[in-house]
Amino acid sequence: MSKTVHYLKDYAAPAYRILKTDLHFDILEPQTIVKSSLTVQPERAGEPLVLDGSAKLLSVKVNGRAVDYVLEDEKLTIAGVPSENFTLEVETEILPAENKSLMGLYASGGNLFTQCEPEGFRKITFYIDRPDVMSKFTTTIVADKKRYPVLLSNGNKIDGGEFSDGRHWVKWEDPFAKPSYLFALVAGDLAVTEDYFTTMSGRKVKIEFYTTETDKPKVGFAVESLKNAMKWDETRFGLEYDLDIFMVVAVGDFNMGAMENKGLNIFNTKFVLANSRTATDTDFEGIESVVGHEYFHNWTGNRVTCRDWFQLSLKEGLTVFRDQEFSGDRASRVVRRIDNVRMLRLFQFPEDAGPTAHPVRPASYEEMNNFYTMTVYEKGAEVVRMYHTLLGEEGFQKGMKLYFQRHDGQAVTCDDFRAAMADANGINLDQFALWYSQAGTPVLDAQGRLKDGAFELTIKQTIPATPDMADKQPMMIPVKTGLLNEKGKAVEFEYQGKRVKEAVLVLTEAEQTFVLGGVNEPVIPSLLRDFSAPVTLNYPYSEQELATLLAADENEFARWEAAQTLYHRAINANRQALAEGRPLPEHKALMDALALVVSGDFDPAFRAILLQMPSETDVWAEEENIDPIQVHQAREALLNAVAVKFLPQWRELNRQAAEQENQADAAVRYEYSPELAGWRTLRNACRAFILRADAAHIEHVAENYEAMAQNMTHEWGILSAINSNESEIRDRLLTKFADKFADDALVMDKYFALIASSRRKDTLQQVQTALNHPKFSIENPNKARSLLISFSRNIPHFHAEDGSGYRFIADKVMEIDRFNPQVAARLVQAFNICNKLEANRKAVMTKELQRINAQEGLSKDVGEIVGKILNEK
């Protein structure tokens, strides 16, 4: 397999630009004929014109005349083109129904959809398919009216008509220049849900959501989420929508979550369709977040886009930050923040510590699809959040305004964004640039002491070596800090000439001491409040100090962090006891702290999240020679101990939560709202503990299942809690669930995820059986993710000592890679942990990776990842 590596340092501006793109799609059966007419502007006259493409080429003309060309390795090269502006016409043929990669133009459910980011447009026609070539598009679509009554593309509809043979046509015009990755087309038999939004300047924007007729009743929440996002972006950022219409199309076969194509967003059905019987509260929150994210891209991604794909985080990190802020304003801000940090630690921290570690702005890539990563998105959002922490809301908004003033309508870089933030605030952010170029999660080791009426806090930063770079420079790291006395009361201190209760300490050196003055009593530092930087922080807290932080810190994130540290220590104590064959410890400090959590006055959503232990991945994050089963057993033992210790309290909290839900009006009792969602989350946490502590309770669940499962949040909570039970009751209830929702594709995804995440002895066998379930298709990304990626995260079964879990996932990676490399590449990342495993498992996993690597015709997507794992030192 030949490798082409692309390097950031090799960037060169395009030799040609495309001022105008006129597309004509003639949708036939089975082929679609695509004609493009491009107005091309030479930037460096004399150089050959090179276009990207993999479609079947029918003809090429320059200024109306056929020309000679060379077509090789998906590059179309035309020499001797005019030195002044000229017209290039290209005709191609594509077969959407045969396109199983779901990139370019493809068929799903009898309809046609596109996905062009990052390099799907070249599957449709030949083009300068890179984000810094921005063009104004018009698109004409011709198709059979009965088969394809709906014909959509970007921008505003400007013309249309019918032919005598039963075919019809529509012409769309996008008045804003855009790169090819933002092109979209949809053709099919779809139902529309309409609404309107009036912008802050008084313009009336039409909103259209397209789904199947059956799914039409499930789009209401997504429509309201869009209107809320449009209003929020005006209020928070002063950004107004710029077209006459905003369209969203939902499709069940989709590689990603959603795509922000200008004026015509295409969404995975998972992030559009919901009602309380089929979607959990978490699903509703996901819809709100993703709808917001894609809408916010209209300015941060579309109006200002990326110069090249190395700059992907310019649009994605910034837009994730914006959607996180939107979600934080819609519900409990601290709970949403904790959710974001948990995801970062669960997925991005391991990525930063593994063979595929890369900076927020990668320096090189083989396959661009592989860089739609947690690092680029979630760590990228944390980088943007650090600007906000350093500059404050006012300073951040000044930077955003300057960014748009300078760059509206341009394709720019992460450095351009940093320059806007720095220049708008008169601050030097040169050192901050290292967040874009250095991979790895910084580790902060802190020590504190009381000296001469001040608290001295010394912080040492270490950035671990990563495959791309061994030696790292000290970074600019904001550490939001407060102090508590031994009774838990906030202590004021002097910093930079002010008397404050909280300060942002900016670490810029490898080791630095901060002096917090006017402190005359023993204090407990509350560090990295609100997770002010994406780092790992170590401080030698005593268990009593952690208990004080959990009980009394004014910063709720810091309270949660203290609980996580107590859990972490308890799990590790269990590991030690299990390894030495000793009885498990009683964990008095943790149990005393949890007694406060279960009995104190807490917001229900916050209480529920305090009860969630760190995952196994969190526990072993900084370790080598990992035995996953040992960590899993230690964590399970702690869960069981907590369940038994507080069984009466779980029952009482469950009763209180049910009472709160029942007090709501019957019409909305089981619908989504942030308040009721908090009570339901707490109730599901209590149910899980009750079922752990009281084995007989499953019979009560079986007898009262219908009464208890009043919406999907309850039903999912119950099934998750009994999912690892070996009794026939679990099988019976899961089968009943599948029968009830057999015709709902998204709920069946939940069913397959339950099967794959069970800890029962027969889980692998049940997963293999599910592959042949009539509602399962391995070609559907949602189904593949729900069953296979869920299984790859099942610690005891994926890491089974006999290697059966590794072998099974390797087989599926190779199978999927033949038709959808993008999904296969996501699945193969389960093997990223290989070189951190203990010797036996490492050897078994390495053998499976070598087997994948030897597969004939292995895609670049999978080959790049496997190669990095096998070559990791």
Q: Which stretches of residues belong to each language-model region?
A:
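Hydrophobic alpha-helical and helix-loop surface patches within well-folded domains
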Residues: 172, 200-452, 456-459
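Long, ordered, helix-rich scaffold segments
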Residues: 373-374, 515-873
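Extended, low-hydrophobicity, Ser/Thr/Pro/Gly-biased non-transmembrane segments
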Residues: 91-194, 219-221, 432, 556-559
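Beta-strand-rich binding/interaction modules
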Residues: 47, 57-63, 428-431, 439-527, ...
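Surface-exposed beta-strand/loop patches in extracellular or lumenal glycoproteins
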Residues: 37-56, 127-129, 135-144, 415, ...
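A surface-exposed beta-strand-loop module
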Residues: 43-45, 52-108, 129, 164-165, ...
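Short, hydrophobic/aromatic-enriched beta-strand segments in well-ordered soluble domains
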Residues: 35-40, 53, 84-99, 137-145, ...
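N-terminal, polar/Ser/Thr-rich
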Residues: 1-33, 106-115, 127, 131, ...
